[in-house]
């Protein structure tokens, strides 16, 4: 947050057209083993971090600006041992609903891009290296398209939501998950 504040203070008097609040972090934690520290860290990154990033950027956002938040398919689809992360992403989804109303008089759109299983280092780091391919295969089997997504596919969805082509899209959640959350 300190770095963000420093960057935004340098932009004083400038305008921000697009804010992509891309925060995500979590651990596979069985229900009986979740600690307060783990809960606070995950919610701190995924919920508190997003809230205060958007709040600090508000003075730079003008009519026509777009805020895009990173959600996740797990916010609507149960996932064993991932309840804290899932709950944090459900909170982010609801930020978009509320903030679209909070900002309606300013003409600022707020949307969520919700990736499914995307082949990133963060996904692989959820399990020990010797189990990664098994994780990838198990997740791909749950995706109707039969594969994991690529980071660039999420980036294209974000670019769309930020563009004028999405000028009448607000408070929506766009799933980039090969259909996983929809069936």
Give the predicted meaning of each segment.
Residues 30-31, 35-43, 135, 139:
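Substrate-binding pocket helix/loop in short-chain dehydrogenase/reductase
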Residues 54, 88, 96:
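Active-site helix of classical SDR
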Residues 59-60, 101-102, 167:
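Alpha-helical segment proximal to the catalytic Tyr-Lys
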Residues 72:
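Residue(s) in the substrate-gating loop at a strand-loop-helix junction
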Residues 77, 158-159, 170-183:
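Short C-terminal tail/terminal secondary-structure segment
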Residues 93, 110, 115-125:
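Short, flexible catalytic-loop segment of classical short-chain dehydrogenase/reductase
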Residues 104, 109, 169-171:
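Short, small/polar-rich loop/turn modules that mediate ligand/substrate recognition or access, typified
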């Amino acid at each position: 947050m300190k770095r963000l504040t420093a960057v935004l203070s340098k932009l004083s008097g400038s305008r921000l057209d697009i804010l992509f609040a891309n925060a995500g972090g979590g651990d596979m934690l069985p229900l009986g083993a979740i600690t307060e520290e783990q809960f606070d860290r995950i919610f701190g990154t995924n919920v508190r971090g997003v809230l205060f990033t958007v709040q600090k950027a508000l003075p730079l956002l003008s009519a026509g600006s777009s805020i895009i938040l990173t959600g996740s398919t797990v916010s609507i689809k149960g996932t064993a041992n991932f309840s804290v992360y899932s709950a944090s992403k459900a909170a982010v989804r609801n930020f978009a609903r509320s903030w679209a109303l909070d900002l309606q008089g300013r003409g600022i759109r707020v949307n969520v891009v919700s990736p499914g299983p995307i082949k990133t280092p963060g996904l692989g780091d959820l399990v020990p290296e010797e189990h990664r391919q098994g994780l990838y295969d198990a997740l791909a089997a749950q995706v109707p398209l039969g594969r994991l997504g690529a980071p660039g596919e999420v980036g294209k969805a974000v670019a769309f939501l930020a563009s004028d082509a999405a000028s009448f899209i607000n408070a929506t959640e766009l799933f980039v998950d090969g259909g996983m959350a929809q069936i």
